[in-house]
């Protein structure tokens, strides 16, 4: 992005030196002069089959600020389950890498696997001694994220859920931090003792 901006500035200076560069600053207007197209939002420059897009206002903030306070999470537990160990290992690596890029502290542990066995007849019309045993192994990975804001948690969860592989399920448990309500802030026994003193006097 910085290289593109610098290159656009060099091209602009070059054209200003040549003298065939005109700028129209009125809003909503678009001027086309000598292979040059200027718009209020983006500048599109063409010079000898070279195209460069340069944003006009780089200082405007992209993030919107709201008065509403963000949700705080003490813990975010993501349980991932699947049948293939290699897929879970790969997904764990991806999720940890994404968390580190966002600056989130993450811990990973592996709960014990669950094995379900089904004993069935080999065929519907066959003797009882001819049986087959099927086994279904479910492997787990638990990702523990701590001390998150609501917006960070939403971005991270959306990113890892969009890249969830086939045959893998996910459960998310959120532990939210809340303020104590006004009616519980003071202990009840203090208010009861004050009422008894008032009634005695």
Curated annotation (Swiss-Prot):
Keywords attached to this entry: Mitochondrion, Ribonucleoprotein, Ribosomal protein
Gene Ontology CC annotations of this record: mitochondrial inner membrane; mitochondrial matrix; mitochondrial small ribosomal subunit; mitochondrion
Gene Ontology terms: biological process: mitochondrial translation
Pfam families: Ribosomal_S10
Principal subcellular localization: mitochondrion
Localization (cell): Mitochondrion
UniProt-listed SUPFAM superfamilies: Ribosomal protein S10
Keyword Isomerase: no
Record PANTHER family: MITOCHONDRIAL 28S RIBOSOMAL PROTEIN S10, SMALL RIBOSOMAL SUBUNIT PROTEIN US10M
Family: Belongs to the universal ribosomal protein uS10 family.
Subunit structure: Component of the mitochondrial small ribosomal subunit (mt-SSU). Mature mammalian 55S mitochondrial ribosomes consist of a small (28S) and a large (39S) subunit. The 28S small subunit contains a 12S ribosomal RNA (12S mt-rRNA) and 30 different proteins. The 39S large subunit contains a 16S rRNA (16S mt-rRNA), a copy of mitochondrial valine transfer RNA (mt-tRNA(Val)), which plays an integral structural role, and 52 different proteins.
Protein name: Small ribosomal subunit protein uS10m
Species per Swiss-Prot/TrEMBL record: Homo sapiens (Human)
Gene designation: MRPS10
């Amino acid at each position: 992005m910085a290289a593109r901006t610098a290159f656009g500035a060099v091209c602009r200076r070059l054209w200003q030196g040549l003298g065939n560069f005109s700028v129209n600053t009125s809003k909503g207007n678009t001027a086309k002069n000598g292979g040059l197209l200027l718009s209020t939002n983006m500048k599109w420059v063409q010079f000898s089959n070279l195209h460069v897009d340069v944003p006009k206002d780089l200082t405007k903030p992209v993030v919107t600020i709201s008065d509403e306070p963000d949700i705080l999470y003490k813990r975010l537990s993501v349980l991932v389950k699947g049948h293939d160990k290699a897929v879970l290992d790969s997904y764990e690596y991806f999720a940890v890498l994404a968390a580190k890029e966002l600056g989130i502290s993450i811990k990973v542990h592996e709960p014990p696997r669950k094995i379900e066995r089904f004993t069935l007849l080999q065929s519907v019309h066959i003797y009882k001694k001819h049986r087959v045993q099927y086994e279904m192994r479910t492997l787990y990975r638990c990702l523990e994220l701590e001390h998150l804001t609501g917006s960070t948690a939403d971005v991270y969860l959306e990113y890892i859920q969009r890249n969830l592989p086939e045959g893998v399920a996910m459960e998310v448990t959120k532990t939210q931090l809340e303020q104590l309500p006004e009616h519980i802030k003071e202990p009840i026994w203090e208010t009861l003792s004050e009422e008894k003193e008032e009634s005695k006097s």
